[in-house]
Each structure stands twice: as structure tokens, then as C-alpha cells.
Amino acid sequence: GMDAFAESPEWGCTFVVLPFMYYETYGDDSLIRKYYNGMRRYIDYLTTRADNGIVSFGLGDWYDYGDFRAGFSRNTPVPLVATAHYYMVVRYLAEAARMLDNRYDVACYTRLSEEIKEAFHREFYHKDTRQYGTGSQCSNALPLFLGMVPADDRQAVLDNLVADIKRHGNRLTTGDVGNRYLFQTLARNGLNELMYTMHNHEEAPGYGFQLKFGATTLTEQWDPRQGSSWNHFMMGQIDEWFFNSLAGIRTVEGKPG
């Protein structure tokens, strides 16, 4: 329903993520301090919507790719995407509490993050196939990126992710939410050649197809002929890879600014 658009966690969590991105880039924690109480209220709201640690509303991996009309997440379960984002912002809040020396909140939200991680693994992990959710690229990339996969299973899940990309002819199936986690999971695991192969072509899904089509701005859909907006801040997550991985311009972990 419309509430998915009004309060999808993948967009709402920007309120928590952005102050940290600002801090990591500039070394300025003023936004974390200024908005801490609001960040906490938002997370406490998500907790009221969770059922045993699982958040089940929102748009999921919006506009993911396949032989269907783009829109609501089709390749990846909405609760998997929503719960992973819930986990991410709770982790951030625990870190914010540590920065503010709020020991009660550190303990509270660290414990909550562990409970969410356990619930996520219980709900979505398939031990027999070593995959999460449907085994889609987003299903496996999200928990890998967020460090939710148990150490013993990590390589197998990553191998399954790579196998799925290859099974799709070195093409992605992620949408506007999953792209970042897919791209960064590959980059952080030294799979930049695969990233290059996945994007260095002129077919949909791919940026080359948009260029060949004549687009001068990013389009909302991988194939602009399908309609939707032809000037949209969408699918631009490769920028982060250009800067961080290709050009080597990135922040040093643990050294903000």
C-alpha cells in the first residue's frame, strides 16, 4: 500500500546513515550529536513495527531487474531487505551512543543489533544451499556487506553470489537499493574485474545501454524504453566504486576525515 512509499525503511534509514557518512568523510560529528535523539526515535519506531526482530514493510529492492515490469521488489523478499536496513541503523546508533558516552544506549542497542542479526539468520538463511532469502544477488550481498554472515559461511555465500552473477551472463539483478550492496561487496572482496565485466557493455541492464540510447542523465529504469523518468537520481551507485575502487579516493577506516 501507500505506507510502503511513505515510510520505506530503506529510505527512512538515511536519517541515521547520512550523519555517519558526513562524519566519516569530514571528521565532523556535529550531525550525529545534533540528531541523535531523532535517530533513536526513528529506530525505536522501527522496533515497534518489528515482529521478533523482523521488519516486513517497505519497497524492498525497488526496481530490481528481470523479465518483468520494474517496481516493487520481485527477486528479493521485502522483509529481508527491510530487516537488514533495520540492523544497519541499530548498529550505527550503538556507535553514536558510544561517541556520546551514553553507556545505557550502547548496551541497549548493541544487544538489540545482536537479536536482529540472530532473527535475520534464523528467518532467511538456508543452511543446505548456503544462501539467504531467494538466493538473489541482493539477498546474499546485503548480509555480506553488513557483516551478518557467520564467519564459517562467508566464503560459501560470496561464492554463491558470484555464481548467480555468472549465471545471469555477468549481469546484475539488483535494483536501486541492492545495487550499492552488490557493487561494494564485490569491491571489498577484491572482485573488481567482475565489477568491470558486469558494467563494460552496451546491453540492459547497464549504463552502456543508457549511453547508447542517448540518455544524458541517469534513467529510472535500466531500459529507458520501458518508460518511467528519464532524469532520475537512480541506479547511480557505481559512482562510489569509481571514486573508492578505481580512483582510490576513500576514507581510511577508523580515521574519519
What is the role of each PLM region?
Residues 1-257:
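Active-site core of glycosidic bond-cleaving carbohydrate-active enzymes
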